[in-house]
């Protein structure tokens, strides 16, 4: 017991006003490819309830090497792989369940193949693991410690059998009270096995007066105002929202301040499709991808873009081409720092709109065109409208306009 306590103490997250080692490495890599693949791919679903038969998983031409090769050629620094989604289906050979790839018609360890391919192409390897498990019986046990043991055992498999893991991305925490997850214990276990690994939990930050109400990234513009919902964490997540241009990094836990960068998650698809569908879906334009790249990798934050394989087990050529074209356009080079955008001259500039919808300045005022928030907007009352922006007397060579659309930014 003394040794265990010693290990836990050594791996505590310390209050700080600047990034720690794991956060420094997270910020440095900056740009990753998200890969959603599993039972949902073959069921045409985004989420499933853990009841889909395991033999539904049946890729016809599985090629994990192709996934990572695309990531490498597109300039990604790391691959973030779904190892287990909310349905509980595992993409590796787990000793603790038969709801995994080894019980399917295609008995190949996806986690191993992706990890090996990352080593081959010189990329870092990260894993997504859903806390919520809709298949595992112990999840519904009266003694939830049974599930914590199950989860801990699976995480140990992932952290010890597949080489270096740069990041663990947890999801689904909303399904249970925060304390049930025993996150300090899980965090310390991860750090003991993989000390440089960054750990994050989706919906990381909450309001001080309501610890189960997560704060949207657009509101995270004041240091030390909001508190951890999931402590400890090395970085913030709010999938798939986008941080404010004035995003702040310091958040509170028990009166102490901690530095937390933000990791963005986007889909290559305009339809916000995480698991690939039978029908080919349009991808975001290069213009949109370029501006989102610059926005999301700015200010010591990071970006992962989801490019999911289809039922054959391959990334579709048109999606691979789109992300590689982005790398060419903005000049992403392997072993070189990520490209940076120029100064945003219009940020918080004075504006004069020709009209405001319903004269509701609080919701749709012209100031929201330049406030740096992706969730706020100027909305005119007229079909044809103008917005005058008072810019500083500095040269510029690009104008970027984000249009508010119903399902995604454009």
Language-model features and meaning:
Residues 1-11:
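Bacterial Sec-dependent N-terminal signal peptides
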């Amino acid at each position: 017991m003394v040794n265990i306590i010693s290990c836990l103490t050594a791996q505590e997250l310390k209050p700080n006003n600047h990034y720690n080692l794991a956060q420094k490495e997270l910020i440095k890599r900056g740009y990753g490819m998200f890969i959603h693949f599993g039972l949902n791919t073959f069921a045409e679903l985004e989420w499933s309830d853990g009841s889909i038969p395991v033999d539904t998983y049946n890729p016809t031409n599985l090629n994990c090497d192709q996934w990572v090769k695309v990531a490498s050629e597109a300039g990604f620094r790391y691959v973030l792989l779904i190892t287990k989604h909310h349905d509980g289906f595992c993409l590796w050979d787990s000793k603790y369940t038969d709801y995994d790839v080894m019980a399917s018609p295609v008995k190949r360890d996806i986690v191993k193949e992706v990890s090996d391919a990352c080593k081959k192409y010189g990329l870092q390897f990260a894993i997504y693991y859903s806390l919520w498990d809709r298949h595992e019986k112990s999840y519904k046990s009266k003694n939830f410690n049974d599930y914590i043991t199950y989860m801990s055992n699976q995480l140990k498999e992932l952290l010890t059998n597949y080489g270096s893991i740069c990041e663990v991305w947890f999801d689904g925490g909303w399904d249970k009270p925060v304390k049930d997850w025993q996150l300090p214990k899980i965090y310390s276990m991860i750090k003991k096995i993989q000390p440089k690994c960054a750990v994050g939990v989706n919906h990381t930050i909450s309001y001080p007066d309501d610890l189960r109400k997560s704060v949207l990234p657009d509101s995270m513009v004041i240091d030390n105002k909001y508190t951890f919902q999931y402590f400890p964490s090395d970085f913030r997540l709010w999938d798939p929202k986008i941080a404010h241009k004035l995003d702040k990094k310091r958040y509170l836990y028990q009166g102490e301040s901690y530095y937390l960068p933000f990791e963005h998650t986007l889909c290559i698809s305009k339809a916000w499709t995480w698991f690939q569908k039978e029908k080919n879906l349009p991808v975001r334009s290069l213009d949109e991808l370029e501006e989102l790249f610059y926005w999301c990798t700015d200010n010591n934050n990071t970006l992962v873009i989801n490019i999911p394989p289809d039922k054959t087990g391959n990334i579709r050529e048109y999606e691979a081409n789109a992300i590689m074209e982005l790398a060419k356009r903005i000049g992403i080079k392997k072993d070189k720092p990520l490209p940076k955008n120029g100064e945003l001259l219009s940020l918080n500039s004075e504006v004069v709109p020709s009209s405001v919808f319903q004269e509701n300045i609080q919701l749709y005022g012209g100031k929201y065109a330049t406030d740096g928030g992706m969730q706020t907007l100027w909305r005119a009352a007229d079909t044809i409208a103008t917005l005058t922006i008072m810019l500083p007397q500095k040269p510029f060579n690009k104008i970027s306009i984000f249009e508010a659309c119903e399902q995604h930014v454009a």
